[in-house]
């Protein structure tokens, strides 16, 4: 979740046409209408038939949900910092109805995986690092049929790209959802305030992120912000600090990701933190298609039908 307006229908039809022309097909399809009709819902509730369990990952027990035919192709949706598996609750029935086995899990230190972390590693380490999140993602991928279609949301997309380079045989496709289109100190490209981020510490950056979310600068509906604030009671602050620090030191794997022959998709809202032009350049650099939606940082919440439509089209093109 960002501090950019994520309200459904927040962009004009003309703006949507400009953002989607040549990218998402027919602008006025039923996916757009369905996204505009999303109600203020209870984000705790997954579709009937959803299975809950835990994945025993290197960092500890990760809370997981799964839905869809057991023998269906796997789709793994990985949330970002301060997020959780519930961010994909609207995508679950759409992917399952299309015949896919859809899964999501909370990152170590986040929401219902709050007890997982570097202290559980062998040997223990002092901080949440990229290796921890990469090994946890690999554990999720190998716990079932491979290769799988992987979506990494924001920070998780940075991790997913590193895992793709390391273990390409585990990926059928890669979707980068609102993933920073940069390496190194990724916040430098954020609209308006990026130039002020150079001297910020991870703790300061995390504090600003949490302040924006808690104060609902996104203007999300009441039940959504209530759920977001509720999960902060479990999410470990040190995990947020460390992840923000990791986003300030992101490895550059652009060329290596480009070299992978799987289908790749960069999916982003036109009001995201980073400029659309930077996303377009990054998509070109890694050999990905670009899709832009009339929303902010959270298309999985606000334009899930359009996002799922475009992912399914990409899956159909996978070998």
Which residues make up each language-model segment?
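An N-terminal hydrophobic leader/cap segment in hydrolases
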Residues: 1-54, 65-67
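Active-site loop/oxyanion-hole signature of alpha/beta-hydrolase fold enzymes
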Residues: 46, 97, 103-151
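Conserved HGGG/HGGXW glycine-rich cap/lid loop of the alpha/beta-hydrolase fold
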Residues: 61-119
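Gly/Ala-rich beta-loop-alpha elbow adjacent to hydrolase catalytic centers
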Residues: 152-156, 160
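Flexible "cap/lid" loop of the alpha/beta hydrolase fold
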Residues: 161, 165, 171-201
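Conserved alpha/beta-hydrolase catalytic His-Asp/Glu region
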Residues: 185-187, 203-258
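Conserved loop-alpha-helix segment in the C-terminal half of the alpha/beta-hydrolase fold
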Residues: 264-301
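Post-His helix in hydrolase/transferase enzymes
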Residues: 301-315
């Amino acid at each position: 979740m960002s501090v950019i307006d994520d309200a459904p229908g927040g962009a004009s039809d003309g703006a949507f046409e400009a953002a989607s022309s040549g990218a998402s097909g027919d602008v006025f399809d039923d996916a757009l209408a369905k996204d505009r009709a999303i109600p203020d819902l209870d984000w705790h509730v997954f579709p009937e038939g959803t299975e809950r369990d835990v994945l025993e990952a290197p960092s500890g027990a990760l809370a997981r949900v799964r839905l869809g035919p057991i023998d269906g192709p796997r789709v793994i949706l990985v949330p970002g910092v301060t997020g959780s598996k519930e961010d994909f609750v609207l995508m679950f029935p759409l992917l399952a109805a299309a015949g896919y086995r859809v899964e999501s899990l909370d990152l170590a230190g986040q929401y219902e995986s709050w007890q997982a972390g570097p202290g559980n590693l062998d040997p223990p380490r002092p901080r949440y690092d990229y290796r921890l999140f990469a090994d946890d993602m690999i554990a999720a991928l190998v716990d079932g049929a491979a290769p799988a279609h992987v979506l990494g949301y924001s920070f998780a997309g940075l991790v997913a790209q590193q895992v793709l380079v390391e273990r390409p045989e585990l990926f059928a496709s890669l979707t980068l959802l609102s993933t920073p289109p940069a390496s190194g100190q990724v916040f430098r490209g954020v609209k308006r305030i990026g130039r002020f981020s150079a001297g910020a510490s991870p703790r300061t950056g995390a504090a600003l992120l949490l302040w924006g979310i808690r104060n609902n600068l996104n203007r999300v509906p009441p039940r959504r912000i209530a759920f977001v604030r509720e999960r902060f009671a479990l999410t470990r602050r040190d995990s947020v600090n460390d992840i923000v620090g990791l986003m300030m030191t992101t490895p550059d794997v652009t060329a290596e990701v480009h070299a992978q022959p799987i289908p790749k998709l960069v999916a982003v809202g036109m009001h995201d933190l980073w400029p659309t032009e930077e996303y377009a350049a990054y998509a070109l650099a890694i050999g990905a298609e670009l899709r832009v939606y009339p929303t902010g940082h959270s298309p999985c919440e606000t334009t899930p039908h359009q996002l799922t439509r475009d992912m399914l089209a990409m899956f159909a093109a996978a070998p």
